[in-house]
Amino acid sequence: MNTNKPVTQTYQNVGSQPAVRTEAGNKVLRNTYMLLSMTLLFSAAMAWISAANNWPYPGVMITLIGYFGLLFLTTKLRNSVWGIASIFALTGFMGVTMGPIVNAYIGAFSNGTELVMMALGGTGVVFFSMSGVALVSKRDFSWMGKGLMIGILVAFVAGLGAIFFQMPALSLAVSSMFILLMAGLILYQTQQIINGGETNYIMATITLFVSLYNLFTSMLHLLGFFAGED
């Protein structure tokens, strides 16, 4: 079963050179984590509402149109107060699409709830591990930028192909790719924030949020495959 669909995110400062860690970078990081926490809670609430009311999955095309439309709007409004409203609209929409996915796994597997919790736990472990490395490491990870951008685009296109042509093996490969790519993106983006390569906390929040979304859905897909449907 593969009801998840990876989403991609364009980001700025790809391949930019890191700067010395500054107080400005620390401030952006604090603001990013604060906004990320709020959007995750809001998205989780919307996912719960969607799941509790058994709302149907809107479909790949509607999901992608809604996501990219709200992403474009948020990018345009990123330097204004309306950018905050827009990012909540974006993450809330993604939460709504998550509800039916979670319901599908809970309904299809006798241990569906356990699979969901394992995917959540795995996502948390990857996020905190990669964030920790970015915060304490003195290594320069800016070289990862271009490779991540290309890899994400390739995986995204392959993911669409797996969905439309019903190719389970390719779908599993894409999920594995996205786990690695999103782990790398969290590492890269976090270092960009603290080194001054990313100065807009709204855009930084989107990148980290989308990374977490893709990590969770990809892990859930792999766990579901290895668990086997009842």
List each language-model region with its residue ranges.
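A hydrophobic alpha-helical transmembrane-helix feature that marks the membrane cores
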Residues: 1-230
